[in-house]
Amino acid sequence: YTLNGDSPQEYLLRLIDQVKKHPRIKTFLNTEITDSKGRAGRFSTTVKTKEGKLEELKHGTVILATGGHQGDTQAYGYGQSAAVITQAELEQELTFGKLDPTTLKSVAMIQCVDSRDDQHQYCSRVCCSSALKNALFLKSKNPNLRVFIFYRDIMVNGSAEAYYTKARQAGVMFIQYEIDEKPRVTSEDGRLVITARDPILNRDIQLTPDLLVLSPPVVPYDNKNLAKIFGVELNQ
């Protein structure tokens, strides 16, 4: 689901149908790009179809939609505690009814996990929106649920800014942290304990959430050959 509750799957199916029916769009499925030469305005690209046939395409622009996926992480006890999951996993559990928000008393979310650092210097641009979306969904099902979001910067654009305000109005608590003072997660008597510096109170605070939700970076799929053909980087 999206921030406003729409189904991306339904939208995607409609979009695919429109592309298939468009008279000026030619679609190649199961096709591999083998070579590309030229410059902006004058490209010549060779593709290999599923039948093994080579076809040369003349075009003026190249848009590389390489795609991405949630990066792996071992931070904050992920993979060791069932109470530590990712935003994508939380969304799946909520969508398919595997998690009942009314059974929870508190949920903590940590943004920029393994992101905007030496390993992944970029911002994925979607993590904050996902956190807001899931936080608002949780609050809609359980208004008394305490939701805390630890963040470095809230990166939402355009109309999504309204959902940041809406989350605050719903009672979601936002706690900012610096890269050199990240939240610390330990376990005491089988419960998660989060210790973090509150910049407003100027002291450490502790939380014991029922669930900890992480936002690891979006990383590119392995498209090294395609990137080499077009001379582009995959980490930007």
Walk through the language-model features, giving the residues of each.
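A Rossmann-like FAD-binding core segment of flavoenzymes
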Residues: 11-66, 132-222
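Conserved nucleotide-cofactor-binding alpha/beta core module
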Residues: 1-15
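Rossmann-like dinucleotide/flavin-binding elements
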Residues: 9, 36, 51-56, 65-157, ...
